[in-house]
């Protein structure tokens, strides 16, 4: 944490050692999992303490496990604003496909009174080579969600893992969505197929890529260097980036457990390493 004063993340600080993040500046996390926030070492009391002095934050909460769609977790913090996406992640596929996809449609058609979240997108959805489900089944669910997104004109949040996944996903995107559709390709990093991602950004005019701590490959500096070179080579890339944490996943090794929270990982680690 060399760039930003850690104290300034949570309150006003008068030290002159580092850059201070203005307390009035809202922070933004483009991809996280609110219902899983407090399953590990982070707790609700610490979370509320971080916002007690007025720091505001906007979270894009990703409900990627269909069996948890109806388990709403409310943070009840006046300084926190949450927008929610609903989708079927390729590692968590249902056996009763038609029923669950219909549930997904009904969620966005506001047919469930017990869901009060502000719904903003379908996802995360896509293909994952580490999934226990076949690519054929993953592809079926991916197509169904893209079809629904097109019908309801909903933004899409993408998940792709495994180099073979990217071109397949890009082809399906072009088949099901028009070039102006709003798309956020989550978790782009040195292991992504960057040629496909470049083509994706060029084809879909309202497309964005999500960057989180997975862009830092401390055990593979060559890949990290190549990724950074690719990143700065993309025209107007600064307008195409969504900063995200994927919290509570992707804990960076550089942070201690007590430092690992949506604010610290979303601000300090990403910005500090980008300056390097």
Tell me the role of every PLM-derived stretch:
Residues 1-276:
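Mid-domain alpha/beta scaffold segments of enzyme catalytic cores
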């Amino acid at each position: 944490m060399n760039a930003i004063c850690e104290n300034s993340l949570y309150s006003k600080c008068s030290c002159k050692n580092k850059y201070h993040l203005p307390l009035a500046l809202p922070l933004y996390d483009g991809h996280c999992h609110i219902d899983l926030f407090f399953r590990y070492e982070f707790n609700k009391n610490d979370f509320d303490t971080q916002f007690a002095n007025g720091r505001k934050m906007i979270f894009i909460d990703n409900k990627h496990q269909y069996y948890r769609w109806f388990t709403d977790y409310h943070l009840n913090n006046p300084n926190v604003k949450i927008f929610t996406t609903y989708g079927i992640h390729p590692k968590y596929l249902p056996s009763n496909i038609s029923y669950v996809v219909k549930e997904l449609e009904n969620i966005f058609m506001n047919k469930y009174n017990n869901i009060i979240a502000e719904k903003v997108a379908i996802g995360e959805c896509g293909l994952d080579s580490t999934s226990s489900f076949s690519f054929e089944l993953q592809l079926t669910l991916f197509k169904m969600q893209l079809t629904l997104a097109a019908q309801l004109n909903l933004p899409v949040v993408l998940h792709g893992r495994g180099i073979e996944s990217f071109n397949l996903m890009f082809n399906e995107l072009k088949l099901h969505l028009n070039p102006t559709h709003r798309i956020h390709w989550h978790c782009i990093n040195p292991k992504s197929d960057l040629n496909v991602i470049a083509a994706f950004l060029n084809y879909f005019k309202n497309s964005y890529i999500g960057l989180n701590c997975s862009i830092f490959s401390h055990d593979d500096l060559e890949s990290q260097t190549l990724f950074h070179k690719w990143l700065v080579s993309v025209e107007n890339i600064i307008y195409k980036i969504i900063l995200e944490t994927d919290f509570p996943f992707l804990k960076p090794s550089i942070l201690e457990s007590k430092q690992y929270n949506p604010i610290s990982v979303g601000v300090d680690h990403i910005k500090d390493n980008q300056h390097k």
